[in-house]
Design a protein with these regions (language model features):
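Short, Lys/Arg-rich flexible segments
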Residues: 1-79, 83-85, 95-148
Length: 148
C-alpha cells in the first residue's frame, strides 16, 4: 500500500480549542451586549443632535438603558422623561387664534408638525447597523482566530 505522507493537525486542534473557548456563553454575551451598547450610544448621539433646542432641556433628558439579555433576545431602551417630548416628536394640535404671551402673538396654525428626532435616528440606525455589525463581528472573529 502506498503512503501519502503524514499530516500534523495540531494547528486545527488548537483552532478548534480557541473557537470553543471564545464561543463560551459569557464571551458571546459580552460581545452582544457590548455591540448593542455601542449601537445605542450612537443612536443616543444622533437623537440628541436631531432634537430641537430652545433652552436645551429636552436634549439633555435623552437616556438609554444598558443592554440586557432576556432569554435569547438582547434589548436596550432609549427614552426621554420630559412630559412634552411626545408632542415635539409626533406633533400636536393647538387652538387657532389663542394669544400666547411667551411669544407675544396669536396662534395661526391648527397643527404643529413633529420633529421626528427619534424616528429619524432609528431609521439611521437601521440603515447603518448591518455594516457596523459586520465590522465588529469580523474583529471579534479575527481575535478569536488569533487566540487573543
Amino acid at each position: 500500500m502506498a503512503s501519502w505522507g503524514s499530516c500534523d493537525f495540531h494547528e486545527l486542534r488548537d483552532l478548534n480549542e480557541r473557537i470553543k473557548a471564545a464561543a463560551s456563553e459569557q464571551e458571546m454575551d459580552a460581545f452582544y451586549t457590548g455591540l448593542l451598547d455601542e449601537m445605542m450610544n450612537g443612536l443616543l448621539t444622533d437623537v440628541k443632535e436631531l432634537t430641537p433646542v430652545d433652552r436645551g432641556h429636552l436634549r439633555r433628558n435623552w437616556f438609554i438603558t444598558k443592554a440586557k439579555r432576556s432569554g435569547k433576545v438582547y434589548h436596550a431602551d432609549i427614552y426621554n422623561n420630559i412630559e412634552y417630548a411626545p408632542y415635539v416628536e409626533n406633533g400636536h394640535r393647538q387652538e387657532v387664534g389663542r394669544y400666547v404671551p411667551a411669544i407675544g402673538k396669536r396662534l395661526v396654525n391648527g397643527f404643529v408638525e413633529g420633529r421626528h428626532m427619534l424616528r429619524e435616528g432609528l431609521f439611521d440606525l437601521q440603515r447603518d447597523a448591518p455594516d457596523f455589525i459586520k465590522t465588529k463581528s469580523e474583529k471579534f472573529l479575527s481575535r478569536m482566530m488569533e487566540g487573543k
